[in-house]
A protein has these predicted regions:
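A structural signal for multi-pass alpha-helical bundles of membrane permease subunits
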Residues: 1-205
Length: 205
């Protein structure tokens, strides 16, 4: 009985839409939804035969891999140095959290103005240096731009979790390793990084 409200919410907002999506994937309707024809797995067969689907799947995989790896690595480095900063730590952490507070639509407009081929400041600087940058015509430039924007937006979220994880590690372990002669690099890889594995797994998933 105590689980009844939670089960009702999950059934209403998860299982029911998922069931509808599954049923609709086995049907085919016109543009206005007036006539519905049961086609079974024909939609899936047409999907897997489409070459553009494989290309889009590969593109999504490359994008996800770059965003996950860069987002986690850069945010971990920033969190590590933020945990070591004593003077101006609050300002440093606040600046790194700001991107998380920016709405995605606003962030998209900002990146568009920065890298626009016609009016973008960064695009103009790159062209001045001899780099032809045009995310509208070059697929590699477009992928790089989207990855950079996604990583920038994700940094603050990952940074908060990594910083909290670093601050939760007992300082006695770090001090004991330092007394034993372990340097900062060795302390990080043998103590801090292994203890951050649950946080890293959570952010990666």
């Amino acid at each position: 009985m105590l689980l009844a409200p939670q089960l009702a919410v999950i059934s209403l907002f998860f299982f029911w839409p998922a069931g509808q999506a599954l049923v609709q994937s086995l049907q085919q309707s016109d543009a206005f939804g007036m006539s519905v024809v049961w086609v079974g797995f024909e939609n899936f067969q047409n999907l897997y035969k489409d070459e553009s689907y494989a290309d889009s799947f590969l593109t999504t995989g490359i994008f996800s891999l770059w965003v996950a790896v860069l987002g986690i690595c850069i945010s971990l480095v920033l969190a590590y140095f933020a945990d070591r900063v004593v003077r101006g730590a609050l300002i440093y952490r606040t600046l790194l959290i700001w991107p998380y507070a920016v709405a995605p639509a606003v962030a998209g407009v900002v990146w568009l103005f920065l890298f626009s081929p016609s009016i973008g400041v960064v695009s103009y600087a790159l062209n001045t240096l001899g780099f032809e940058w045009n995310a509208l015509l070059n697929s590699r430039d477009a992928m790089a731009l989207i990855v950079m924007a996604a990583v920038w937006k994700q940094l603050s979220y990952n940074f908060l979790f990594f910083l909290a994880g670093l601050q939760s590690i007992p300082k006695s372990l770090i001090e004991a390793a330092a007394i034993d002669g372990a340097g900062a690099w060795r302390r990080f890889w043998t103590i801090q990084f292994p203890l951050l594995s649950p946080t890293s797994f959570f952010l990666l998933v």
